Design a protein with these regions (language model features):
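Short beta-strand elements that form the blades of beta-propeller/WD-repeat-like
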Residues: 1, 11-12, 17-27, 82-86, ...
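Aromatic (tryptophan-biased) beta-strands that constitute blades/sheets of beta-rich domains
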Residues: 2-5, 40-69, 101-109, 151-155, ...
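Repeated scaffold domains used in trafficking and secretory/extracellular systems
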Residues: 4-18, 62-63, 68-77, 112-125, ...
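A broadly used, surface-exposed interaction patch
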Residues: 6-56
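A short local loop/turn or secondary-structure capping micro-motif enriched for an aromatic residue
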Residues: 10, 29-30, 93-94, 103, ...
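Solenoidal tandem-repeat scaffolds enriched in leucines and small polar residues
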Residues: 53-144
Length: 248
């Protein structure tokens, strides 16, 4: 197996027919973002030992473009030829598929007393031509994808530490690190439920949210089934929903 860069991939999205991913090494305090063609075979890049020596100049092997990130990427999404991401303690950025910067914004501000790190970006959602940026503390901003103009802002209205957000159009499913999950629609919480762990994957099937949590498959408005292996991803095949687990 080829490894273009000797670090774990933290985020990956499809953009303009290619893969855009981020690689992070916390020990060496470095991060990369690169675009890889889906038509070409992966190449093997530098080793971890070589990276320690040339940590500032080593790039992702075989990439169309690769950039040294000035801080750790904490969220990544894409739509068409645009890539939207957030960097820890820095801001929110939008680039095109050639890595040209289109716009940038500062992080969301928390008013008054708030828990530590609550203004950090917890997730990014895309709804039509708008970007919804969620802070870990539950604030959100709606931003124009085209020019980065802030259109509106709001709040989930509960104490939380947002870990991920799934959406089906304007219907959002918010997952908190303490196991709470909320369906959020039309600016208000419609369902709140405490799960055994954070949400690994979720898809709205047209009537309800199908959720994979810690060794548990859940219908948000219904029951749940426990499982031995860890669920990773929901897959629909021949009108049947299945769960891909960590055993393949």
């Amino acid at each position: 197996t080829a490894h273009p860069f000797p670090c774990e991939i933290s985020f990956a999205v499809l953009c303009d027919g290619a893969l855009v991913a981020t690689w992070v090494d916390h020990d060496l305090r470095l991060a990369r973002m690169a675009m890889l063609s889906l038509d070409d075979a992966l190449e093997t890049g530098v080793t971890k030992a070589e990276l320690r020596i040339s940590r500032g100049s080593s790039m992702v092997a075989g990439s169309k473009w690769c950039h040294v990130m000035e801080a750790e990427p904490v969220a990544l999404e894409s739509k068409d030829d645009k890539i939207i991401f957030a960097l820890w303690s820095r801001g929110i950025y939008c680039i095109d598929s050639s890595a040209n910067e289109l716009w940038r914004l500062p992080l969301l501000e928390e008013q008054g007393k708030s828990p530590p790190r609550s203004n950090e970006v917890g997730a990014i959602s895309i709804v039509d031509d708008e970007v919804v940026v969620w802070s870990r503390g539950g604030k959100y901003q709606r931003i124009s994808l085209a020019d980065g103009k802030v259109l509106s802002d709001g709040s989930l209205g509960v104490d939380c530490d947002i870990e991920s957000v799934f959406n089906d159009g304007e219907n959002f499913l918010v997952s908190s690190n303490d196991g709470w999950a909320w369906e959020f629609s039309d600016g208000q919480i419609t369902i709140a439920r405490r799960l055994r762990g954070t949400i690994q994957d979720a898809i709205h099937d047209g009537s309800d949210w199908r959720i994979i949590s810690w060794r548990e498959d859940i219908m948000l408005r219904g029951g749940s089934n426990t499982r031995v292996d860890l669920g990773v991803q929901l897959v629909k095949q021949d009108e049947t929903w299945m769960v891909l687990d960590n055993q393949g």
